[in-house]
Regions:
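N-terminal module-boundary/linker segments of secreted carbohydrate-active enzymes
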Residues: 1-5, 11
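Domain-level detector of nuclease and nuclease-like folds
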Residues: 9-174
Length: 174
C-alpha cells in the first residue's frame, strides 16, 4: 500500500515485478507515549559492512539508511547490531498466507487482518498490534515486541492508533 499511497513509483520496491509483499519499514524503541527519533549519534551513515547486514531485510538500502538515522540511532546499538535486530524482529513475525503475496486487490476489515496475523503468530494477541489505514487503504501492520525481540507485548500507545474503518483495500503485490 506504500506504493499505491502517492508518488512512490520510482522507488525500487514499487517497480512492477519487484514482488514485494509486506516489508520492514522500521524498528524503533517505543515509549508508553511516543517514541524517540533522530537521536545524536557519531555514526550518521552506516558503514558498508553494516549495510550488507541490512540487505534482504529492507526493500532497499536507502530505506535502511533512513531507518538507521531516524530510529537506529536511538536504539543504543551499532548499525550492524541494529540491522541484525531488525532481521530478528522480521523473522519473528509470520505473514499470514492469505496476505503474503496477494495477486489481486482485496477488501478486508482491519479486524480480519488482525485475526489473520494472530492466527499465524503464536503468542500474538489483540492489544499487541495495530492495523493502520489511510484513505480506505491498508497502510501498515504495527506489531509490538519485547525489548529482547523474543516475545510479543501489549502496546496501548500503538493500538490506540489502529484503523477504525469497517473495510479497507489491501493492494496486490507489484
Amino acid at each position: 500500500s506504500f506504493c499505491a499511497s502517492g508518488n512512490n513509483d520510482d522507488r525500487d520496491q514499487c517497480q512492477i515485478g519487484s514482488n514485494h509483499g509486506f516489508v520492514v519499514h522500521g524498528l524503533w524503541p517505543q515509549y508508553e507515549r511516543g517514541f524517540p527519533s533522530d537521536c545524536p549519534s557519531p555514526i550518521r551513515n552506516p558503514p558498508a559492512s553494516a549495510m550488507r547486514d541490512a540487505e534482504g531485510v529492507f526493500p532497499d538500502l536507502g530505506l535502511a539508511r533512513y531507518e538507521w538515522r531516524k530510529h537506529g540511532t536511538c536504539s543504543g546499538r551499532s548499525p550492524s547490531e541494529y540491522f541484525a535486530d531488525v532481521r530478528r524482529a522480521r523473522n519473528k513475525v509470520e505473514i499470514p498466507s492469505e496476505l503474503e503475496q496477494p495477486r489481486s486487490a482485496q477488501r478486508m476489515s482491519p479486524l480480519d487482518i488482525q485475526r489473520a496475523f494472530i492466527d499465524a503468530n503464536r503468542g500474538l494477541r489483540p492489544g499487541m498490534m495495530a492495523v493502520a489505514c489511510q484513505r480506505g487503504m491498508l497502510q501498515e501492520v504495527r506489531i509490538c515486541l519485547s525489548k529482547d525481540l523474543r516475545d510479543f507485548r501489549p502496546c496501548p500507545e500503538v493500538t490506540r492508533q489502529a484503523c477504525r474503518s469497517q473495510q479497507i483495500n489491501v493492494p496486490p503485490v507489484r
